[in-house]
Regions:
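Intrinsically disordered, low-complexity terminal regions
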Residues: 1-240
């Protein structure tokens, strides 16, 4: 009887450990045998980064992706175009101890960049477009860059991520935070609109706008600029 009970306990423990291992996923350590690979990616004007990868965007005449990293890590990076969106992520249930990994995205024009997770996007040579641009973070990722010329720019954070954009030239700029993230903007705009719901901060005193509308519902703070008209609303402990 004792032997049977012990067997049941051991079997049960083995199943629990196996299940936990499956949930945790596979750990892959980079070989440090570095290679480069070019991935075909045609006809996209949006980037969606899922997970913890770090990528850089280069405005270029030809659309493609270049990946530089360990030869056993590169096959674990998934890049594909869904509609007009370039999707970038690691394979499911894989934990990457990546060491050096560079993912470079090239495209003539982008209208939206989004992060769902803890990854980072850096704009290397800015974005020049006559259309609108949208930046969105859901999680703890970061977006940074300089040299943005567009019709309308919208920045939103849901979580603890950060956005830092400089040398902005836009007719209209909107920025919103829901959470504890931070937005830092510098440049020029005709219209600016800021909204904070949470503890995050918007630093836009160096974004020279003619007309500015700012509202806070929470404990965050907003610094802003208006040369002609400022509308400010505070609901909570935050300050404008």
């Amino acid at each position: 009887m004792k032997t049977s009970l012990l067997l049941v306990l051991v079997t049960g423990l083995s199943l629990v450990l196996t299940a936990g291992s499956c949930l945790q996923g596979k750990h892959v350590v980079g070989s440090k045998n570095y290679i480069s690979q070019e991935v075909k990616a045609d006809h996209f004007n949006e980037i969606k980064l899922l997970g913890s990868a770090n990528i850089s965007y280069h405005q270029d005449t030809r659309s493609h992706v270049e990946i530089h990293g360990s030869d056993n890590i590169i096959p674990l990076v998934e890049t594909y175009v869904d509609g007009n969106t370039l999707m970038i992520k690691f394979k499911k249930n894989v934990s990457i101890w990546k060491g050096k990994l560079e993912i470079k995205v090239f495209a003539p024009e982008l209208n939206k960049l989004s992060i769902n997770g803890s990854g980072n996007i850096k704009l290397i040579n800015g974005i020049q477009t006559s259309k609108d641009i949208e930046f969105h973070i859901n999680g703890s990722g970061n977006i940074q860059g300089e040299g943005l010329n567009c019709r309308r720019m919208a920045v939103s954070i849901n979580g603890s991520g950060d956005v830092r954009l400089q040398q902005i030239e836009s007719q209209e700029c909107q920025a919103g935070i829901s959470g504890s993230g931070n937005i830092n903007l510098k440049g020029k705009a005709i219209q600016a609109k800021y909204a904070i719901a949470g503890s995050g901060n918007i630093q836009a005193a160096d974004l020279e706008a003619e007309n500015t509308d700012a509202s806070i519902s929470g404990s965050g703070n907003c610094s802003c600029y208006a040369s002609q008209k400022l509308v400010a609303r505070e609901k909570g402990s935050g300050h404008i």
